[in-house]
Amino acid sequence: MIQTTVLHPKHLEAGAKMVDFHGWEMPINYGSQLEEHHAVRTDAGMFDVSHMTIVDLTGERVKAFLQHLLANDVAKLTVPGKALYSGMLNPDGGVIDDLITYYLTDTFYRLVVNSATREKDLAWIRHHAIDFAVSVTERPELAMIAVQGPNAKAKAAKVFTPEQNAAVEGMKPFFGVQAGDLFIATTGYTGEDGYEIVVPQEKACDLWQALLDNGVAPCGLGARDTLRLEAGMNLYSQDMDESISPLAANMAWTLAFEPASRQFIGRAALEAQKAAGTQLKQVGLVMEEKGVLRAGMPVTFTTASGEKREGVITSGSFSPTLGYSIALARVPRDIGEQAEVEIRKKLVTVKVTKPAFVRNGQKLV
């Protein structure tokens, strides 16, 4: 049985092309993926992300629980509302999921996890919560709308109440605040400014319509994917999964090895990988000639000593902002500034870059 979000009627009303996304019927576009992409890079667009899973954690030992569960350290969160991005790892150091954690009070944290991993995430979290007497509450009655782009905050301000505007004034990135019936967070998956707004289901359609009336363009999963790829943001199950180390997925910055006494799940495996120094790494690829880089394509190169090496593209697409093809790839660490990708039985030279291409409207390559 395919699931739908509370905003499903609004998508049909807007003429969306609907697709099955991990068991959810979601909009892939509303006519033009390209126009939706550019709307977010140059103005303001909105996405229905109500399929994401919101999980509230409460208990006296909830901080200690999250310090055990997550590879990043929630002890960094000292101001209520502050959030961090982290991997949730298995004992082998593979990524069960990547998620955002909000610190709300000393006994209350909120997680936002991926929809495709919902069941295994909840089972894993609940299993480990038992030892810490932490209560795990899924919040399916909440919907979520992401409003993204250089003009997103200004347009959202027209929809917020004066109290909500006061609550978000001057709020830095990666913060969330409960303001009236909305939980408003300065997070996103596009590389642009904006909010992710958690709203009670019964008020979601009105909020969507109000944003629409104020010139925010509805955007589908197609544009969401090209935007996050340009920003160099991982997509779970493509760029990392339970068999992939965060060290091989450009997530080393999310690993908190200090203090040494914090024994988070997967720590020993990661320390062994670091000591071995043989872990693959994630890079960006740029191909300015015609053709499109796609996930699964092999990436080959020759080292300075003449040895042949091979990696693989994990995410690839035409970049609407740059006007040529880009990709994220997992490759041996000794890759140089160029590599080759086989496209239609022809080897094409690609430039190797850092794994981020566009942020805040600025081209990085």
UniProtKB/Swiss-Prot annotation:
Domain of life, per lineage: Bacteria
Cited InterPro entries: GCS_T (IPR006223), GCS_T_bac (IPR022903), GCST_C (IPR013977), GCV_T_N (IPR006222), GcvT/YgfZ/DmdA (IPR028896), GcvT/YgfZ_C (IPR029043), TrmE/GcvT_dom1 (IPR027266)
Biological processes annotated in GO: glycine decarboxylation via glycine cleavage system
UniProt-listed Enzyme Commission number(s): 2.1.2.10
Reactions the enzyme catalyzes: N(6)-[(R)-S(8)-aminomethyldihydrolipoyl]-L-lysyl-[protein] + (6S)-5,6,7,8-tetrahydrofolate = N(6)-[(R)-dihydrolipoyl]-L-lysyl-[protein] + (6R)-5,10-methylene-5,6,7,8-tetrahydrofolate + NH4(+)
GO cellular component, as recorded: cytosol; glycine cleavage complex
GO terms for MF: aminomethyltransferase activity; transaminase activity
Alphabetic keyword roster: Aminotransferase, Transferase
Disulphide-bridged cysteine pairs: none
Function recorded in the entry: The glycine cleavage system catalyzes the degradation of glycine.
Subunit structure: The glycine cleavage system is composed of four proteins: P, T, L and H.
Family: Belongs to the GcvT family.
PANTHER family recorded: AMINOMETHYLTRANSFERASE (PTHR43757), AMINOMETHYLTRANSFERASE, MITOCHONDRIAL (PTHR43757:SF2)
UniProt-listed HAMAP family: GcvT (MF_00259)
Protein name per its UniProtKB record: Aminomethyltransferase
